[in-house]
Amino acid sequence: MKVALGVVSPDGALITDVEQLNGKTLIVSKGTTAETFFEQNYPEVKLAKYDSYTEAYIALLDGRGDALSTDNTEVLAWAIENPGFTVGIESLGSLDTINPAVSQGNETLLNWINEEIVKLGEENFFHADYEATLRETYGENADADSLVVEGGVI
């Protein structure tokens, strides 16, 4: 799966561009990619930092911040479960991937997995799997191409 940062905010004050966060309070969890990204790239955005994701989401629900940022895979699913909130920025920062892992030095398994990913990509397996298992989580409006890696190629 592809993953980047996402930003979720209340529908009544929807954040659709990172520049809209200037002078506003953005909720993040401590020690996360979101915290580091905003500290390094947008120091003018005030960060409200929480120890856990649960505390961060509760802070957004309680209005202690203007928006919340974490992995887009999380905020997209959370917004569906919480009417009145929308992900206005679906992809921010570097695009990363979530991949299978093997023990260092296990070239046989690594090569087999890589070959299988390519073969399955030729069948559009990962898009079909997304539709079968994750479509409900991310909703009808989510773009599968923004989350799915097919054949190991971004």
Region locations from a protein language model:
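Secondary-structure junction motif
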Residues: 27-41, 110, 128
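Conserved functional loop/turn residues at catalytic and ligand-binding sites
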Residues: 25, 49, 64, 124, ...
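Short beta-strand-to-loop elements that line the ligand-binding cleft
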Residues: 28, 45-53
